[in-house]
Curated annotation (Swiss-Prot):
It comes from the Bacteria. This is Translation initiation factor IF-2. Belongs to the TRAFAC class translation factor GTPase superfamily. Classic translation factor GTPase family. IF-2 subfamily. Residues 44-78 have a biased composition (Basic and acidic residues). Residues 171-340 form the tr-type G domain. It comes from Natranaerobius thermophilus (strain ATCC BAA-1301 / DSM 18059 / JW/NM-WN-LF). Pfam families: EF-G_D2, GTP_EFTU, GTP_EFTU_D2, IF-2, IF2_N. Residues 280-283 are annotated as: G4. The gene is infB. GO terms for cellular component: cytosol. Residues 180-187 are annotated as: G1. InterPro entries: EF-G-like_DII, EFTu-like_2, IF2_II, IF2_N, P-loop_NTPase, Small_GTP-bd, T_Tr_GTP-bd_dom, TF_IF2_bacterial-like. It is found in: Cytoplasm. Keywords: Cytoplasm, GTP-binding, Initiation factor, Nucleotide-binding, Protein biosynthesis. Residues 32-90 are annotated as: Disordered.
Amino acid sequence: MEKIRVYQLAKEIGLESKELVTTLQELDISVKNHMSTLSEEEADTVRELYTESSAKDEDNKDETSQQQDEKQEDKKEQGTTTDKPLVAPPITVGELAEQIGVESTSIITKLISKGVMANINQNLEEDSLEYLAQEFDFVVTQEEPEEDEKSEEDRIIEQIRSEEPKGEPLERAPVVTVMGHVDHGKTSILDSIRKTKSIEKEAGGITQHIGASRVLYNDKTVVFLDTPGHEAFTEMRARGAHVTDIAILVVAADDGVMPQTVEAINHAKSAGVPIIVAINKTDKPDANPDRVKQELTEYNLVTEEWGGDTICVSVSAVQNEGIDELLEMVQLVAEMNELTSYPQNTGKGTVIEAKLDKGRGPVATVLVEDGTLKVGDSVLCGSTFGNIRAMVDDRGKRLKQANPVTPVEILGLENIPEAGDEFQVVPDEKMAREIAKKKQEKEREEKLKRSQSVSLDNLFDQIKEGEQKELNIIVKGDVRGSVEALRESLLKLNDNEHEIKVNVIHAGVGTVSESDIMLAVASNAIIIGFNVRPDPNARKAAEREQIDMRVYRVIYEAIEDVKAAMAGLLDPEYKEVVQGQIEVRQLFKVSRIGTIAGCYVTDGYIRNNSYIRVIRDGRVIHEGNIKNLKRFQDDVKEVQQGYECGILLEKFNDLKEGDIFEAYTYEEISPDV
């Protein structure tokens, strides 16, 4: 009996594959994805029943939508009221105590029990304030004036970026990057696609190599980035650009998975980009596609015919074989990902590449990702700006406007932007100039600030600031066995109890290269080398980007360094340490100051930052802080056993002669990994 694939049936009845897969599962027809097969009988069932079932779906959608609207109305009508005190950050411990009517020592004690050391004048962090709100029954409010803290340019940019979509969303073309090992045929495949499918074949003209090109297949456009390889891809991602929708991984059938193949896999996975495998050079006598598929399984790329979900296409760039199927799979993945854009919005997108042309000045190739870009528009492009004087597409044709996912060269910028910079249309050139100038000043300030790159030395501080508990690592070694041993040892450090996660995002054989540095920048990773040295370019790039790169000769030393850094990621524990005992021998009441206790240190010592317990008849009657510690008329930091001193407690005067002060502090215990 003849069988048909899900995506073929979807095309036949005018549905998207994703929608049909859902429908089939609702009909109890066993399918996994768009490549699953259906019997002729099952296909006929779908053809007959789909119209009826889709009509039911529409009715259900209307009912659900109506119910949701009603629920939202109910919520709006209900509203919420509260009698609890309202507290708005920023606020100090002392201010909070006064506002909610409790002793500051009570707040400090609660914070210490949570592992936060604080004093009366210290500003409370957001998580500490939320914790105290639960303990003391008040409400933390976020005040509106925070808006005023944002700069004018930030508000304008945010407003433009969060523009409400205009009109209906339209399906857009996918953006594809071709990756793989050197000499496996990345450029040959790109050339083969361009020769047979380029848009200029349909309309005439000469292809202009502007950094990206469009091809036409099945009356739909696909955009290919012209610079093959993962280096350019990762360099753009390091600058925050996420242009690529699909990665084509080229593997030579006669050579198999090689070091740069593994790099490309890890780069694509790190970016969360779907991978289509193109097994090239299948026309060669020693081609062995099955060996390639077997090797790919080691990197969790299992082809569909072997029960996985990785699309794999056999091609020969030289003989133009498999190109159609490759493009069909690209369009299928794009359809499953439901790529859309809003042409009526103002233009925004990403710089693909830029250069200084002697005759034309700064020239940038941009990819319009959303909205429409027009000649005469004022644009902000990274930290530069300009008024678009002219636009040229990949066929050399001058355009008056560029629609979504159209690569164009633009002229009229003040300076050369960098690949990966975002661009967006702004209301006028004056505004663009002002925003660009302020962004340039901000960039200069940021360069003077501390590096944002993660390192084993500052890992704990950065994790505390970012409230994350992950460590990304790139491993390079001299031989495969050492690399795998180091990788496995690092992964064993994952501590689920404390939610610490070590991610080895790439492990490869060979020297540390510039490509590794760019991946580290993009993924905020550290690099560990075992018995290998970085090449000169990598060393310079690591210094420039301030990437923590460490080289070891003993695996144990690498593991110990990472363990030490991870120990800093764990929430610290504290133990109480008693410093000394002090006896109150005389009291002096001073107006406007309080009761000063004349004391004698009977054991240990007392410091001016010690916490104090007041003990009377064996019972603790007060816990608090020292306001003043004196020897005669002088303020002192510490008084040792056998000496007298004067002590003024903070907000506590109910003392009696014979009371005992117990001085104590808290010490942090570094947890074991």
